[in-house]
């Protein structure tokens, strides 16, 4: 009897000693410092600014210290009791990498998937680590076990996959249907002339540049012919063209001819036109531009234009050569007469082509400009000429431009 009682007494003494030693350690470590900080402070007693304590949240005021925020990457997750807790041995293992915590179900091995009805299989510590990332397949929710730090409990969260990753297949299908319906509606409202306008604009083809010989022509008329209420570029009126480069004091002439035959954009017939010969002995002037009321325009291909001979250095104001563009197409009205009165023109002129009822045939006339009397934006004599451009201070006429400088017949 004495021996058991002595054993019990020794156990009680050991427990008391252990409890008292824990209390002393707690006071030394500073765990009780927040409790002491809540006690009233005597105003008469002086305190130092520095308190040798481990807890940095202790302040010298009567306010309750704010608990420190959670570390980054450890959100507050509510613990659910529906799922079985993993064994306690997992808490002493190091934390798994983030890729193992939230691995998507599509790339996990097949053996890692098991239904929630199957009991957890006993495994080694290494196998138990991989089991913490197991996805329990359910409909429509999925339970994901996340392994946190070594001193935290393993917490199970329930995630609704439908809310996190919405199905975008239906939205994509609706978008494609709406886009297709809009395109069909637009195509239904457009006629053949609108399609011709889209495919034959000057900016798209980039081969032809518009010029005009009428002083009343404006920019949009240089690009399009007005047909009723719709604007369609008049590409069905193609023509042959001759470009002459003539040097003063010489008898040689360089003639470039190019015949162009193209299927009409608005009709199913083919149109071919020829150019009457031009007398180059007489230099035409601006009087060949025609009456102001007539609407005339032409289209000159860049390849047909020649570069003026720059082997001889010229000064501003000297005449060295001219560019003469002569194009002719169709027949004019009875009131209009062509500048070339030769009899060969009447013989070689093709019969009047069939044109739209609200449009008149166009007759193209000659234009001549001196290339060596104009200076470019850098103050040099123009050498390379091209067709196109529009003058800002002059009314648009039959003109050419040198580099960036636009040249017109003259102000009006």
Swiss-Prot record:
ShKT domain location: 371-408
UniProt entry keywords in alphabetical sequence: Signal
Membrane spanning stretches: none
Region of interest called Disordered, as start-end residue ranges on this chain: 85-134, 250-294, 327-357
SMART domains, per the entry: ShKT
Biased composition (Basic and acidic residues): 348-357
InterPro entries linked: ShKT_dom
Biased composition (Polar residues): 124-134
Signal peptide, first to last residue: 1-21
Compositionally biased region (Low complexity): 88-105, 250-259, 266-293
PROSITE patterns hit by this protein: SHKT
Tree of life domain: Eukaryota
Biased composition (Acidic residues): 330-347
Name this protein carries in UniProt: Uncharacterized protein ZK1290.10
């Amino acid at each position: 009897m004495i021996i058991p009682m002595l054993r019990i007494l020794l156990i009680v003494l050991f427990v008391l000693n252990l409890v008292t030693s824990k209390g002393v350690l707690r006071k030394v470590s500073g765990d009780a410092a927040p409790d002491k900080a809540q006690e009233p402070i005597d105003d008469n007693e002086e305190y130092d600014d520095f308190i040798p304590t481990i807890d940095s949240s202790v302040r010298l005021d009567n306010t309750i210290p704010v608990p420190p925020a959670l570390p980054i990457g450890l959100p507050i997750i509510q613990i659910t009791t529906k799922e079985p807790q993993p064994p306690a041995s997992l808490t002493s293992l190091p934390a798994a990498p983030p890729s193992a915590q939230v691995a998507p179900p599509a790339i996990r091995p097949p053996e890692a998937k098991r239904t929630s009805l199957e009991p957890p299989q006993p495994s080694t510590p290494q196998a138990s680590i991989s089991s913490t990332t197991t996805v329990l397949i359910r409909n429509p929710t999925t339970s994901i076990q996340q392994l946190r730090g070594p001193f935290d409990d393993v917490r199970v969260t329930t995630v609704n996959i439908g809310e996190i990753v919405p199905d975008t297949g239906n939205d994509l299908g609706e978008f494609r249907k709406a886009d297709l319906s809009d395109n069909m509606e637009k195509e239904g409202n457009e006629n053949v002339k609108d399609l011709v306008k889209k495919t034959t604009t000057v900016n798209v083809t980039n081969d032809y540049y518009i010029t005009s010989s009428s002083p009343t022509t404006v920019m949009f008329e240089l690009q399009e012919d007005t047909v009723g209420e719709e604007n369609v570029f008049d590409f069905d009126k193609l023509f042959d063209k001759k470009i002459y480069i003539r040097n003063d004091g010489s008898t040689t002439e360089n003639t470039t001819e190019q015949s162009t035959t193209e299927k009409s954009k608005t009709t199913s017939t083919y149109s071919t036109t020829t150019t009457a010969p031009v007398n180059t002995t007489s230099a035409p002037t601006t009087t060949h531009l025609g009456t102001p009321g007539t609407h005339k325009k032409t289209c000159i291909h860049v390849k047909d234009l020649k570069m003026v001979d720059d082997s001889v250095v010229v000064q501003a104001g000297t005449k060295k050569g001219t560019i003469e563009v002569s194009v002719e197409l169709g027949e004019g009205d009875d009131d209009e007469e062509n500048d070339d009165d030769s009899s060969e023109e009447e013989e070689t002129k093709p019969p009047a082509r069939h044109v739209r009822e609200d449009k008149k045939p166009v007759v193209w006339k000659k234009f001549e400009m001196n290339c060596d009397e104009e200076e470019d934006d850098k103050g040099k004599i123009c050498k390379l000429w091209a067709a196109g451009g529009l003058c800002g201070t002059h009314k648009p006429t039959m003109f050419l431009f040198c580099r960036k400088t636009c040249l017109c017949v003259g102000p009006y």
